[in-house]
């Protein structure tokens, strides 16, 4: 089934730039889990780690930057400032370099070292924040920096910016619909800013009101899954819409890391721990289904950002 993929970005993007290659990622069949599923149940993963900046956050970062330019809030000479667990910051850095904007990010001190090195390689100014407060603490610091000089900074505020989820409403969801020929029955992904979940589910529910949507989160507040929120104990993003959730699937850090390793060694996919959490949750859900189903999840980022931590 063909569905036109909305491309609101095209008018603002020069062909041949790095931004022009964000999105249109492949949808991969995860066959190594087939023998544990009922006949007709399939698991697919959207390979967002293959975006130019290496993560699903490329889409939202581009959308927020373009919206900033369109609205006049982002002007030449301004610096982009935001809180991040790492991936959105890397996406800001890549796109900022391409479009001529300096970038400053606030991220927890315990963010993975490879992510920090990538940010530094782009010339990003890093402000490390209290690791015990996770990204909630980073948001507080980012707001303080922005408030100190609002004429200098563009603050996308990814946790509360509708351009975040609209990126997935306009691009990711139509891609999934077309790549599954409209057969998707279940969508499973983790919650960080919640932009991917909210945008994809809102659009796909317009196309298939019976779509079941599962939100993945760590099973405890103290976890090792960078980028994912334990919603019961974290600051809930302003863009999050609980009404879209069919059910919540909780994943232990250990299970996510084991699945991350299996993805590399049995499927040839070197991805990060949040991807492992998504696939583990999708597998547990799929294994419970007795009727034919198409379960789609997301590979959020590449495993290169976790070498020496997840992979030893």
Model-derived segments and spans:
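PLP-dependent amino-acid enzyme catalytic core
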Residues: 1-312
